[in-house]
Swiss-Prot record:
Residues of the signal peptide: none
Coiled-coil spans in chain: none
GO aspect biological process, one term: translation
Source organism (scientific name): Neisseria meningitidis serogroup B (strain ATCC BAA-335 / MC58)
InterPro entries per UniProt: Ribosomal_bS21 (IPR001911), Ribosomal_bS21_sf (IPR038380)
Name the record gives this protein: Small ribosomal subunit protein bS21
Length: 70
């Protein structure tokens, strides 16, 4: 768990923002949500495969030349 030292005369909101950023950087919340309920190995493989296909499609779409507009 990330630890944040609150500096002297630092507002609570700023310290809270730094803490949230540190938690987000470690990926703690995403890991917690993933472990919240059991996911069957086949479901996990299927989800990861779908995410990989989606990433590939996005990469190909960004590399593709735009259609001619004339």
């Amino acid at each position: 768990m990330p630890a944040i030292r609150v500096k002297e005369n630092e507002p609570f909101e700023v310290a809270m923002r730094r803490f949230k950023r540190a938690v987000e950087k470690t990926g703690l919340l995403t890991e917690l949500r993933a472990r919240e309920a059991y996911e069957k190995p086949t479901t996990e493989r299927k989800r990861k495969k779908a995410a990989a296909v989606k990433r590939l499609q996005k990469r190909l779409r960004s590399q593709q030349l735009p259609p001619k507009m004339y």
